């Protein structure tokens, strides 16, 4: 009885298992079969054609799975139809790709970073669905993943490449659709891949980001949009370069024009000297005046570098540059200022020494102007002239600079102690140091001049250049020698270039034979006051040092109030030190800002004592003592502004 019941049950189970095979749901069976045999069910060689592959597959199928009996099939149909609906079995549909059908190609928009490119040694157009499935299974085996996680995205026929990507197993919503190519390649076993897919030849695997990104970017660049972008970029670059070149050329032109104007303003024109033309055979050899012939004119131009250039011109064809100082057309000898013969040796024109060694008429007239020029201004006139800057500029241009020629200073190597080679002390008012060595005249030299004060008071000031590293000892020797109570410094240590060295100590310093002690520092709004004690042997001197730092670079201050306050403080200290030496004033060259301070100080004393001021006479007096004092027309205007401001603050009782 038990055998009768067990046999139909066993037949039923076999029928169900066979029905699963015929309905193509035989994955479980194949897996078991493959597991037992430890080798794949179907092996295809790449040299076999499709027909031979089909024959081998069908023979293997019949050999392993013999056809069931008709009774079993009829029984099995009833069960399979109810549980496993299946279409008619056609092996060609499973193994061959129908024309126009790409069941395994997904063509999804996967990012390049997630795509893997596999390069094969066989033509892509020879691949069919069967080979693609084998390829997918081999890649999955090399990755240790399920075949369902490997997706063939695109076939590249020209390069014999297959694009694929790997999806994560059990992907949750919100997770990326494909894994990163770099991450997949790290887990790929290339040896397993090549052993599983020998029919595909040599296989090379790489991420698309490295293989194709450069090509894609190049394609984008040379597309229509990329071409336009390149053209726009080149156009912008050319425009920028052109603009920079234009700006550079304009800047060069402005600098050249500025240099030419500066050189033109600094040129010194000496008075034309009439030269006698060669006498004709009909004239007497000793005749000096030949009215029937146009005399030649010798015009000497001294450029800012101190080079003299003699120039001979005929007055009949060339007009002489007008001189700002006009001479009355009186007698010939008076007009010339000398009875020296006008006959010159033309071969000696290259040597300009005689023009320097002998005082020229032009220089004499310039000195006469400096000693006699005057324009007294009352308070209303001072306010009016301050409002007319062009009148002040014209007046300033008439004042001779009275610079000194280096050959007038008979001291060897004196140039080593000059900050600027064209700014030299006037020999008549030069400060001479007590010689350290009688045989060394250079030890007596310092670039400094005594300056007269109000009413021509002798040695009221000393105007000097900013000390250099090799003249600091000379500077302190001069302060000690002259017993100066006050030092006024109107410059920073550096304004683009060095203007002055730090010549005082922080606490204590020894300079030559003079010891300098700083005993107090007082910081004011626009200047710093230091109380100094100078010692030499058993003797001491007290000196106040004013360092004015509010003067802007390359222009005059906007307000004269700080300079006026400095001047009043210095004047108070000077009066408190009656009987001592001159006030030492310096900037960098010792003529520009130094001249402004001294001229303002003298003018304020004149306003206080007389109620009027003669700024023109004051500046001329300064230039007699030191050439170039009050260096520019802007500084000349600034002096008038400072005097006008001081005058407005004077009370009627103060004016005498």
Curated annotation (Swiss-Prot):
The protein's name: Receptor-type tyrosine-protein phosphatase R
Q: Give the positions annotated as glycosylation sites.
A: 23, 128
Describe its assembly.
Interacts with MAPKs.
Residues of the Tyrosine-protein phosphatase domain: 392-646
One of the entry's Gene Ontology molecular-function terms is: protein kinase binding
One GO cellular component term, please give it.
cytosol
Residues modified as Phosphoserine are 271, 338
Q: Name one GO biological process term.
A: signal transduction
């Amino acid at each position: 009885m038990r055998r009768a019941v067990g046999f139909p049950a066993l037949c039923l189970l076999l029928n169900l298992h066979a029905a699963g095979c015929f309905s193509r749901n035989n994955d479980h069976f194949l897996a078991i079969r493959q597991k037992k045999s430890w080798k794949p069910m179907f092996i295809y060689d790449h040299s076999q054609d499709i027909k031979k592959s089909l024959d081998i597959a069908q023979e293997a199928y019949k050999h392993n799975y013999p056809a069931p009996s008709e009774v079993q099939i009829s029984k099995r149909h009833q069960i399979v139809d109810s549980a496993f609906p299946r279409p008619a079995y056609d092996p060609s549909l499973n193994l061959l790709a129908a024309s126009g059908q790409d069941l395994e190609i997904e063509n999804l928009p996967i990012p390049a970073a997630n795509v893997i490119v596999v390069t094969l040694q066989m033509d892509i157009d020879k691949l069919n669905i069967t080979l693609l499935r084998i390829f997918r299974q081999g890649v999955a085996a090399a990755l240790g993943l399920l075949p369902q996680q490997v997706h063939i995205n695109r076939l590249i026929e020209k390069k014999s490449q297959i694009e694929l990507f790997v999806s994560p197993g059990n992907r949750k919503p919100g997770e990326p659709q494909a894994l990163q190519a770099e991450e997949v390649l790290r887990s790929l076993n290339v040896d397993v891949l090549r052993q599983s897919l020998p029919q595909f030849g040599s296989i090379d695997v790489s991420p698309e980001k490295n293989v194709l990104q450069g090509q894609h970017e190049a394609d984008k660049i040379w597309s229509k949009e990329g071409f336009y972008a390149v053209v726009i970029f080149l156009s912008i670059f050319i425009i920028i370069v052109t603009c920079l070149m234009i700006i550079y050329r304009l800047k060069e032109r402005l600098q050249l024009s500025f240099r030419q104007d500066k050189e033109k303003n600094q040129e010194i024109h000496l008075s034309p000297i009439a030269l006698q033309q060669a006498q004709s055979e009909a004239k007497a050899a000793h005749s000096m005046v030949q009215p029937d012939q146009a005399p030649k004119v010798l015009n000497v131009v001294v450029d800012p570098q101190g080079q003299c250039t003699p120039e001979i011109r005929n007055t009949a064809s060339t007009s002489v540059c007008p001189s700002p100082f006009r001479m009355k057309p009186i007698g010939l000898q008076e007009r010339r200022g000398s009875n020296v013969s006008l006959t010159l040796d033309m071969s000696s024109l290259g040597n300009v020494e005689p023009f320097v060694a002998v005082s020229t008429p032009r220089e004499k007239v310039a000195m006469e102007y400096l000693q006699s020029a005057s324009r007294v201004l009352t308070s209303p006139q001072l306010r009016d002239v301050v409002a007319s800057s062009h009148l002040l500029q014209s007046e300033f241009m008439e004042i001779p600079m009275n610079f000194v020629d280096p050959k007038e200073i008979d001291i060897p190597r004196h140039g080593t102690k000059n900050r600027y080679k064209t700014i030299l002390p006037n020999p008549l008012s030069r400060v001479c140091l007590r010689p350290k060595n009688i045989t060394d005249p250079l030890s007596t030299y310092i670039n400094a001049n005594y300056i007269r004060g109000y009413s021509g008071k002798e040695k009221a000031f000393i105007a000097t250049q900013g000390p250099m590293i090799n003249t600091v000892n000379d500077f302190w020797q001069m302060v000690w020698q002259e017993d100066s109570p006050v030092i006024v410094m109107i410059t920073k240590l550096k304004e683009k270039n060095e203007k002055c060295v730090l010549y005082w100590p922080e606490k204590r310093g020894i300079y030559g034979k003079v010891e300098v002690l700083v005993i107090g520092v007082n910081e004011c709004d626009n200047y710093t006051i230091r109380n100094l004690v100078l010692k030499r042997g058993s003797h001491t001197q007290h000196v106040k040092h004013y360092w004015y730092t509010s003067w802007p670079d390359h222009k005059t201050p906007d307000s004269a109030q700080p300079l006026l306050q400095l001047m009043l403080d210095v004047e108070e200290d000077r009066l408190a030190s009656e009987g001592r030496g001159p006030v030492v004033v310096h900037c960098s060259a010792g003529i520009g800002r130094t001249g402004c301070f001294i001229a303002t100080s003298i003018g304020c004393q004149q306003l206080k004592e007389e109620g009027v001021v003669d700024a023109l006479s004051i500046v001329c007096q300064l230039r007699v003592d030191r050439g170039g004092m009050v260096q520019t027309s802007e500084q000349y205007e600034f002096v008038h502004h400072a005097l006008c401001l001081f005058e407005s603050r004077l009370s009627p009782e103060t004016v005498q």
